[in-house]
Regions:
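Cleavable N-terminal export/targeting peptides
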Residues: 1-25, 253
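Transmembrane beta-barrel domains of Gram-negative outer membranes and organellar outer membranes
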Residues: 20-253
Length: 253
């Protein structure tokens, strides 16, 4: 899954592209994998209302990203997902940007850990736009979460990597989510996304990406997954206003 991994090195090399649009999938993971023989189809949508500060052309940030994620459970603790990344550019052009695969394993409940934990490894090809070359990239995402009464907390200390192209790196961008559930129907809270730099160099605060905003989860039906939110950039190199929506549908028995 492509998450907030746009680092300072990308800013230097591709300043007009790096923060012209939000990432294609904006999500903090929970530790459980999908059940055995179940499949979930998820549409990740996000729109950048306002890009990084001081863009020469503010309208150049107005991308609508649409990503289809299909995940199947092959066991009680293992799933495999595939992603198809697309975008509608500010000029209205529809573009296919790439695809990833993502195996993930979770700690079995029989181990009786006091926290939930899982690990995903994502890999594939991606390009920022049709005028750019595809590059091989991916991420390693540990997931640690915990439910305490009506409160839920999840931490994803996400690590991304780029294997080809001028922006080869191994970066670090933790993500966090907390939710308070009301009558088991609605969850309200906030999500926080970062891109701090590479393992060779953590950037200064103003050079990093920090996005924070309110979110809502709807638990209307076990077959459906609905999550939405609005993110605000906390640094000049962050997109300043991004809206996100996730709609998922489970099928199978």
């Amino acid at each position: 899954m492509r998450n907030f991994k746009l680092l300072l090195s990308t800013i230097i090399i591709f300043p007009s592209i790096s923060f012209a649009q939000a990432d294609n999938e904006i999500q903090v993971y929970a530790s459980p994998t999908i059940g055995k023989n179940l499949t979930i189809f998820e549409l990740h949508s996000n729109y950048t209302f306002k890009g990084i500060k001081n863009l020469p052309n503010p309208k150049s940030a107005h991308y609508l990203n649409e990503s289809l994620e299909i995940t199947h459970g092959f066991g009680d603790n293992f799933e495999l997902g595939v992603y198809f990344f697309t975008t509608i550019a500010p000029n209205g052009k529809y573009e296919y940007l790439g695809s990833h695969i993502r195996p993930r394993v979770t700690v079995p409940q029989s181990w009786k850990w006091k926290i939930g934990a899982s690990l995903s490894a994502e890999f594939g090809f991606f390009r920022p736009g049709t005028n750019e070359s595809y590059q091989w990239e991916g991420e390693i995402r540990p997931v640690i979460d915990k439910t305490i009464s009506n409160w839920y907390f999840s931490l994803n200390p996400n690590m991304d990597f780029m294997l080809t192209g001028p922006d080869k790196h191994f970066g670090f961008g933790p993500q966090f989510k907390t939710v308070y559930t009301i009558q088991q129907k609605v969850g309200v809270g906030f999500e926080y996304y970062t891109a701090l730099g590479t393992f060779k160099r953590i950037h200064s605060f103003n050079e990093e990406e920090h996005l924070l905003g309110p979110m809502i989860d709807l638990y209307l039906n076990p077959k459906w997954e609905i999550n939405g939110g609005f993110l605000f950039g906390l640094t000049p190199n962050s997109n300043q206003q991004v809206v996100k929506l996730l709609i998922g549908r489970r099928i199978g028995k």
